[in-house]
A protein has these predicted regions:
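Bacterial N-terminal signal peptides
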Residues: 40-51
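Short linear loop/turn motifs
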Residues: 32, 230-235
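Alpha-helical and His/Cys-centered functional microenvironments
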Residues: 14-16, 39, 236
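Beta-rich nucleic-acid/ligand-interaction surfaces
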Residues: 134-136, 233-240
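Bacterial N-terminal signal peptides that target proteins for export
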Residues: 30-42
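Short, positively charged and aromatic/hydrophobic N-terminal segments
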Residues: 16-19, 23, 28
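Extracytoplasmic cell-surface/polysaccharide-interacting catalytic and binding patches
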Residues: 55-129, 141-228, 236-249
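Ser/Thr/Pro/Gly-rich low-complexity, intrinsically disordered segments
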Residues: 1-8, 12, 16
């Protein structure tokens, strides 16, 4: 018997039925009703809308985290970043560099304070600004006392409790005269006695008046004074800034 040739009729059968001869043709699928198609489209759109967005990568630079170098905004603000030197309550240099980074809004407000004080023959000198969370942890390892250091807490490797400095929304500073010399204050920086408190009534009246003058200048631009430290001020809306662990150098 001669082998069966694959002729025109066989190819036509395949084109017409989608099956080779001898095969049972599959049952033709019915088209999806229009209302079912619309329902599927709506459900798909809702799923896409409510699906959680992919978590963005953590920032690795101050700029990516929304921090600005204060000296770029107000170059005439003096820096005395104590934690970049041993001249602080830990007696250890814990910062790799003497830099001052703050949230953009906070930095701009500080620049306005500086401009206003300059008209009065005064200026600002900054002791501390943004503090990476890892440094806060180092502070705690050196001085585990909540009266002096905000206890840092992390969950799944992410900071959940820390200092307002970790948010880039707090600044420690003092006043200087036109020559850059410190103006007398009730106590030194990082003094954890009652002299540091804003309600302290002892000591030199002129020093207390200077602290009040600094407070008035900062409050004018929206800063919130910390009652226990005459040098510490929080930027408005600090609660809306996340805790950061972005290094700087």
């Amino acid at each position: 018997m001669a082998p069966r040739r694959r002729g025109v009729n066989q190819e036509q059968t395949v084109l017409d039925t989608g099956k080779l001869p001898g095969m049972v043709a599959a049952k033709k699928e019915m088209p999806m009703p229009r209302h079912a198609v619309l329902r599927w489209m709506v459900l798909t759109a809702l799923f896409v809308a409510i699906a959680p967005a992919a978590r963005a990568a953590d920032p690795t630079t101050p700029a990516a985290a929304g921090l600005v170098d204060v000296t770029k905004v107000a170059p005439d603000i003096k820096l005395d970043i104590r934690y970049a030197t041993p001249n602080n309550f830990t007696h250890v240099a814990v910062y790799p560099a003497a830099r001052c980074f703050l949230r953009t809004d906070v930095a701009n407000r500080l620049a306005k304070v500086q401009a206003d004080l300059k008209k009065q023959g005064l200026g600002l000198k900054v002791f501390d600004c943004y503090r990476p969370f890892a440094i806060q942890q180092k502070f705690w390892s050196l001085v585990p006392n909540e009266d002096w250091v905000a206890k840092p807490v992390a969950k799944d490797g992410k900071p959940v409790i820390g200092s307002k400095h970790n948010r880039g929304a707090a600044v420690d500073l003092t006043l200087v005269d036109a020559s850059g010399k410190d103006i007398p204050m009730p106590s030194g920086f990082d003094d954890f006695t009652e002299k540091a408190r804003r309600d302290y009534t002892g000591g030199d009246p002129t020093a207390r008046a200077n602290a009040k003058r600094l407070e008035a200048a900062m409050v004018k631009e929206g800063f919130e004074p910390l009652p226990s430290e005459w040098w510490h001020f929080d930027g408005p809306g600090w609660q809306g800034y996340e805790l950061l662990n972005v290094p700087f150098n």
